[in-house]
């Protein structure tokens, strides 16, 4: 996928590690033997098999798998429909739908990319249709989906690494992130509301909105 670029970068780093002490100036470092470099890369917690990789293989994989099960089961579309039914009628409702849908989906997926792909395919065209410009629509969706990484209970990979480095239960990190996550999405909500007011946008028409009761019945 990456091609030879990564191979070249690794080769340059190895060459620099072995012969970098011969360089004069600020780029110079103390002399390292090849055996020391190999030992440091493969047998210490700061090398390739480090704490972040261990956490990823042990804990993050399980939560990602759980989130994918929910997405495949239709939870993603359910959250989108629920957001449209709840927020679509308000001023600038399309953008607010994107925010709410991304925040809810963020509770089961800590991946900003997966969040964007799942919700953006629906919310970005909807925002453009209701009067938002394309670049603004994409920005709202990207920022909303990125916030899913700090939305408990399933956050981004960094949250698991933080818990591992600090030696505290993951739940403490998740609880500490509740207030920042709420403030993050509230600020984003007010931003799109002010933009909608300035542009004179209105909510979606009643016939375009799904009924809340129908959405809940279908989802459960």
Task: List where the protein language model places each region.
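Hydrophobic transmembrane alpha-helices of multi-pass solute/ion transporters
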Residues: 1-65, 82
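Transmembrane helix-loop junctions at the membrane interface of multipass transporters and ion channels
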Residues: 157-170
